[in-house]
Amino acid sequence: MTAPLPLDTRKLLLLTLAVLVVWFANLDYRKLIKPDEGRYAEISREMVASGDWLTPRLNGIKYLEKPPLHYWAGAAAFTLFGQDEWAARLWSALTGVLGIALAYYAGRSVFGASAGLYAAVVLGSCLLYVVVGHLNTLDMGLTLFLFVSLCAFMLAQRDEGSARENAVWMHTAWAAMAGAVLTKGLVGLVIPGATLVIYTLIQRDWRLWQRLRPITGLLLFLVITAPWFIIVSMRNPEFAWFFFVHEHLLRYTTTIHQRVEPWYYFLPLLIVGWLPWTA
């Protein structure tokens, strides 16, 4: 007779099956929500139709507000699976599932198998995480890359890891930051950087900055991000000012984008979003 699976393995398999069913079985249960879902799906559709995967366009007009990674993923899904709601939301669903898997792996690696399992269960059952994982928006892809960068940074600090393993994890963090930048812009670099500064101030471990592999890490970051930014700027001379100044500097320093919410705007969203664990 086949030996029964260990308890933790059975739990993990059941959790994996439940997540896959919840995430992928009902991606097309409703129409795309205006304006974001429809906008991003249309940009991906126009990439496929025009064959121009360099300059995003919406209704034939250049759409340079955000980098192209999410649009590329949507266009690839449309090419492989057809143009429908399921394919439009596939990238968000995939990145959501990968985030849950990463929560398990990172928790298990640092704190043990039970901690990893609980981390995956909590993350995968949070209301906001489930909802965003079923929306065709940039947020879940950005969340995954930020999560990878921070978890990889954490794993690179383990004393039990070899020098080679720690170097791999640190370069993974740099690559993930590059993915975040290609998803939603410079916020993909600012958030991990700010987190690192705060962590350093708390730990007072200034040698941490020497372990970042800044030369090879930054080189890897630029190898991933620079080609699109350079080429799209050459093809679209207005891109650099519009993207870096209008969409970044002015967005966060002025009210030009009508972002006038108070500083506590996201606190109620977080409380509701982390249900049922905030109940």
Model-derived features: positions:
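Membrane-integral, polyisoprenol-dependent glycosyltransferases
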Residues: 2-279
